[in-house]
């Protein structure tokens, strides 16, 4: 899908009102830690391996651009985004994506992530991801929001989902494993 700009806050508010008048709840999705190529193009310094030549992705698929959870500016950015969401979307839910994040190719090799895991005694990137999702959830809870996530089987086996998370399957055949 070609990149064709963005919605203004006012346009989003009008869309939410239009949908609400028809009984439809609009739930925003802010993808983390991956699927954020536009963010990588705008703020390459937020990522484990910054590349100032990153372009906005115009097709589907997975990239190696994962935000680095150990850069303070990343958390300031998301705090501001979550505050703005509260003013635009009355829904009590924010979907965080959370799928198709190649942790073994990014966080596993990120110097800041490696240092953090060593300091905290974490055995792998899945423990780091669980903590990351929990922190994102806490930040949204301040604004009265709860999270939803896409289901990833390896992450479920690693027990990254926290109590109260709503998880959706999107890959064929995975639904039975989400309810076990």
Task: Give residue spans per PLM region.
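Substrate-binding cleft of carbohydrate-active enzyme catalytic domains
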Residues: 1-143
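Substrate-binding cleft/loops of secretory-pathway carbohydrate-active enzymes
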Residues: 42-46, 105-107, 148-180
């Amino acid at each position: 899908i070609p990149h064709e700009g963005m919605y203004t806050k006012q346009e989003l508010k009008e869309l939410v009102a239009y949908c609400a008048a028809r009984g439809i709840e609009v739930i925003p999705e802010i993808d983390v830690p991956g699927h954020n190529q536009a963010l990588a193009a705008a703020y390459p310094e937020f990522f484990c391996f910054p590349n100032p030549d990153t372009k906005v992705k115009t097709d589907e698929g997975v990239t190696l651009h994962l935000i680095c959870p150990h850069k303070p500016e990343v958390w300031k950015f998301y705090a501001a985004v979550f505050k703005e969401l509260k003013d635009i979307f009355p829904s009590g839910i924010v979907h965080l994506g959370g799928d198709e994040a190649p942790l073994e190719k990014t966080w596993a090799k990120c110097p800041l992530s490696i240092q953090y895991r060593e300091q905290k005694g974490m055995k792998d990137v899945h423990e780091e991801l669980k903590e990351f999702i929990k922190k994102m959830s806490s930040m949204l809870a301040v604004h009265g929001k709860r999270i939803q996530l896409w289901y990833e089987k390896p992450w479920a086996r690693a027990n990254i989902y926290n109590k109260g998370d709503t998880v959706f399957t999107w890959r064929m055949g995975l639904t039975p494993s989400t309810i076990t």
